[in-house]
From Swiss-Prot:
It comes from Rickettsia felis (strain ATCC VR-1525 / URRWXCal2) (Rickettsia azadi). It is an enzyme of class 1 (oxidoreductase). It catalyses: 2 reduced [2Fe-2S]-[ferredoxin] + NADP(+) + H(+) = 2 oxidized [2Fe-2S]-[ferredoxin] + NADPH. SUPFAM superfamilies: FAD/NAD(P)-binding domain. Keywords: FAD, Flavoprotein, NADP, Oxidoreductase. The keyword Oxidoreductase applies. This is Ferredoxin--NADP reductase. It holds the Pfam family Pyr_redox_2. GO terms for molecular function: ferredoxin-NADP+ reductase activity; flavin adenine dinucleotide binding; NADP binding. Its EC number is 1.18.1.2.
Amino acid sequence: MTHTTDVVIIGTGPVGLFAVFQAGMLGMKCHIIDAQEIIGGQCITLYPEKPIYDIPAYPKIAAEELIKQLELQAAPFKPVYHLNQQAIELNKQDDFFEIKTSKNTLIKSKVIIIAAGAGSFGPNKPPLANIEDFEGKSVFYFINDKSKFAGKNIVIAGGGDSAVDWAISLSEIANKIYLVHRRDKFTAAPESVRQLRHIAETGKIELVTGYQLNALDGNNSELQSVIVKDLQNNTRKLDANILLPFFGLKQDLGSLANWGLNVKLHHIEVDNSYYQTNIEGIYAIGDIAHYAGKLKLILTGFAEAASSLHHAYSRVFDGKALHFEYSTTKYGERK
């Protein structure tokens, strides 16, 4: 089946969904492609219950709720979703691009917005003997239902945002949390680190710094303890039912890497004015985009979506100038 639209957006994470809204506000029709069966990207697939603290007007919002609200915001513009399929082939035809998906869907558009986050993703697993025996029962790389960790003794490994944020969140329901990190300094947001250290003073979280994961001990997929080791090879046994290793994601751009885009370390290089790639009419926004001074924040991706689509307006509408209007005016006219 062949479709024709104004904009194709690759990725249905928060930035991709906000791009749908921005395009709609500018009168552009959108088709969206995502490899997952449901919309939401990493927010839904990896951490639907994870609290997000840096969305304006929301002191705290769960990832799944953010996706729900973004979907509702985009819905009036009637986007067409092509889920459970990947964008695998790109062809340029006169003023149009043609994308072919893994389900042989063909979509023609004048503009492409790549908001694919980390691309295809999977966890970086710690090199522990027999860890696969515990996966899915005692060892988890993603959390989609934190209630199952209530009353548990949990080892969280890592020093970034995911490790610190989950330690804070799970401390409300867990019996005990050990946060294992090879250094005393954490790379999470400073305010999150401040909260972490405050909770650690109460004893709900124990900071096990200067140590790394060394071994797992248990029977029949039931974890009983986690062995950690410091730089002097001194070991310590942590009594725990659950291990949550948060060492980031493996990234793979898949077929996007073959589209002639400038790619560096699994990211797409863009200009930092309008986030256009080296191919005119193709933009990259959100975590997949790279430029000097890039901040990997959801709100940064929102701004990139707005800028790129305002810039793309003249291409979609054959050189027509865009006269800026505030959303209250535009939405009022739509109603």
